[in-house]
Amino acid sequence: MSAHKAVCFLGSAMVTTWSSLFAPFAIASAFAAACPDVEVVFARATTEPPGVGQVGHAFVDSLRSQVRGRSVAVYPVNYPASEDFASSASVGAEDARAHVQATVTNCPNTRIVLGGYSQGALAIDLITAIPVSMAGFTPAPMAPEVANHVAAVAVFGNPLDRYVGAPLTTVSPQYAEKTADMCVTGDPICSPGSMSVPTHDEMFSDAHLSYVKSGMASQGATFAAGRI
């Protein structure tokens, strides 16, 4: 091997070696750069099309306007949102739980905001409340250490009070202080005492559909912004 070829070979080997050494750091940096400051995990209401729904959009828009300078990512919980409440909400809970755990693992510095409207609120209940089976719903509790990564929980028109006679702030010891459980006056979905599956008319009542117009979606965002 000539001296020139030897130098070229040695240089190539050194570049390869240094590249191998620094590749993991480069990959880690790329992942860190891709992690948002804040991630909203939001579950839409019954029969709304895939996405975060009308209340979710209002909530996210308001939150972004209040945390300017910070990146805000959004994850729409992937679930049927069908009128088969127990089965559908349980699927949503498992999807939300799995996504939150993945975010905590891959982006430990990201502050997570959980949210849900109507049936979507129930999906969030199932991952944050005391894990007790009720009316066919399947709890999907998050690991205790996840709570440190969750900045706030905001639920709207939450049927939990209807089913168990108490809001999420009462039945979720780990998340109570960081939770806003919002119910419009006269909303039959989140009013206590019924202990029955909401009817179609109740789900589409004027009160239950008023969370954007009433300003409660923005109020929930203000609560969340104050905890990020």
Question: What residues fall within each predicted segment?
Answer:
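Fungal secretory targeting signals
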Residues: 1-32
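Secondary-structure junction/capping motif
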Residues: 3, 13, 53-54, 137, ...
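Generic anion/oxyanion-binding catalytic loop in active/binding sites
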Residues: 21, 85, 142
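Sterically constrained small-residue positions within well-ordered secondary structures
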Residues: 23, 31-34, 68, 144, ...
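Short, charged N-terminal helix-start/capping segments
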Residues: 25-47, 85, 151-163
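Active-site catalytic motif of lipid deacylating hydrolases and related acyltransferases
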Residues: 33-111, 185-228
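Serine-dependent carboxylesterase/thioesterase catalytic core
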Residues: 94-115, 119-176, 180, 189
